Amino acid sequence: MEFTGRVWKFGKDIDTDAIIPARYLNTTSPEELAKHCMEDADPSFPQKVRKGDIIVADKNFGCGSSREHAPIAIKAAGVPCVIAKSFARIFFRNAINIGLPIFECPEAVDGIREGDVVQVNADRGVIFNMTTGQTYTAKALPASMQSIIQAGGLMQYVKTRVAEGK
């Protein structure tokens, strides 16, 4: 998998309430969640984000409540992946489980600016900043997690495995 997009940059400790405010948790519609993605971190984000744009954040992205709505909102907003210095553990697992690729790469976060265009090779964990020409390598996810992401999430992964008789 490869993604190319414009960067939206966020700071440290962006919690799940900033990603998708609690006032919208009465819906499970990905399309509705996307309309409010990141609005407490940047109120104009839902109107400005475009399909393919990439979120880059500092450390501890996705901390706070253990809501699966947060990575669902990001994915439904058309953001194909998130790059951060680190992720809260529960967000990390929820992102994998819904098929949202995430990459931990402190060097990339420090070197990428909002508005830069980056290309991410998800299979190799290579992040190329097309604006500056810099290349970074993210921590590789275990093969099992990569398989879940490539399947589109844990549910689809399990359905496929069952259908294959595995």
Swiss-Prot record:
Family listed: Belongs to the LeuD family. LeuD type 2 subfamily.
Record's keyword annotation contains Amino-acid biosynthesis: yes
Subunit record text: Heterodimer of LeuC and LeuD.
GO biological process: L-leucine biosynthetic process
Catalytic activity from the UniProt record: (2R,3S)-3-isopropylmalate = (2S)-2-isopropylmalate
This protein's UniProt keywords: Amino-acid biosynthesis, Branched-chain amino acid biosynthesis, Leucine biosynthesis, Lyase
Free-text function comment from the UniProt entry: Catalyzes the isomerization between 2-isopropylmalate and 3-isopropylmalate, via the formation of 2-isopropylmaleate.
NCBIfam families attached to this UniProt entry: leud, LEUD_arch
Alphabetical list of PANTHER family matching this protein: 3-ISOPROPYLMALATE DEHYDRATASE SMALL SUBUNIT 1, 3-ISOPROPYLMALATE DEHYDRATASE SMALL SUBUNIT 2-RELATED-RELATED
Pfam families the record matches: Aconitase_C
CDD domains: IPMI_Swivel
GO molecular function: 3-isopropylmalate dehydratase activity
SUPFAM superfamilies: LeuD/IlvD-like
E.C. number: 4.2.1.33
Leading EC class: lyase
Pathway: Amino-acid biosynthesis; L-leucine biosynthesis; L-leucine from 3-methyl-2-oxobutanoate: step 2/4
InterPro entries: Aconitase/3IPM_dehydase_swvl, AconitaseA/IPMdHydase_ssu_swvl, IPMI_Swivel, LeuD, LeuD/DmdB_bac, LeuD_type2/HacB/DmdB
Name of the protein this chain belongs to: 3-isopropylmalate dehydratase small subunit
